[in-house]
Amino acid sequence: MSEREKITIENIVASTSLAEHLDLSRIALALDGSEYEPEQFPGLIYRLQEPKTAVLIFRSGKVNCTGAKNIEDVKRTIKIIIDKLKAADIEVYDDPQIIVQNIVAVYDLESELNLTDIAMSLGLENVEYEPEQFPGLVYRVEEPRVVLLLFGSGKVVCTGAKEESEIEQAVIKVKKELQKVGLI
């Protein structure tokens, strides 16, 4: 099984722009089940069941999508929103550019980790490890620019990636570094 096959994407956050300006009160009426309380939060919240995602829509036309497990679900979510808004005669862009802001994924090194030894070997400039405050070791990878959270169980959480390939690169890199010093 390749490294990529062992990586599980938990969440993708992406953004786009649907228009120059949106009337959120009108959209709240068009999107059944949406939540819009401008005195509480400036955006409209709309949750989809399939794919299981949520979008935040702002008056500026900006939209954030969260909860997707793959890029196709992000695209499907945005298309569903566009179709629903157009059906309600709300003018929006046909094919807006979607930008991935963050991918969160998990990986299992399948080996227990001694985080104290790892903190010493990876170098203090890229590592934060304060077990009294947080049980994981925070490892800031410079290339690709992601953050890995390593746990004693061998589980690794990767955050900050913009592409799936960056997660795979970071996992391969940390595995090589830990193997090189005999820590896995």
UniProtKB/Swiss-Prot annotation:
UniProt keyword tRNA processing present: no
GO MF, any single term: DNA binding
Alphabetical UniProt keywords: DNA-binding, Repeat, Transcription, Transcription regulation
UniProt keyword DNA-binding, yes or no: yes
Sequence repeats: 9-85, 100-178
CDD domains documented for this protein: TBP_archaea
GO BP term, example: DNA-templated transcription initiation
Chain coiled-coil ranges: none
Family the UniProt entry places it in: Belongs to the TBP family.
The protein's name: TATA-box-binding protein
